[in-house]
Amino acid sequence: MAKIGVENSLTDVQQALQQQGHEVITINSEHDAQGCDCCVVTGQDSNMMGIADTSIKGSVINAHGLTTDEICQQVESRI
């Protein structure tokens, strides 16, 4: 399965993605996002960690306003 980076405050999303069989990495800094197929961020400060500018190979999903299920669906559609 995919390697998904998830911002540390999104524990419900981390658990849901792990249950789907994904490898979940907690993102605490820009460096943590490297090597991830996809990253999920809170969007509270849209580029606080510089993730939007990093050269990760996958998508960056803004979780703001989305349910856990909606986030998981977006992850599945982008990997």
Swiss-Prot record:
InterPro entries: UPF0180. It holds the Pfam family UPF0180. It comes from the Bacteria. HAMAP family: UPF0180. Belongs to the UPF0180 family. This is UPF0180 protein BCAH187_A1552. It comes from Bacillus cereus (strain AH187).
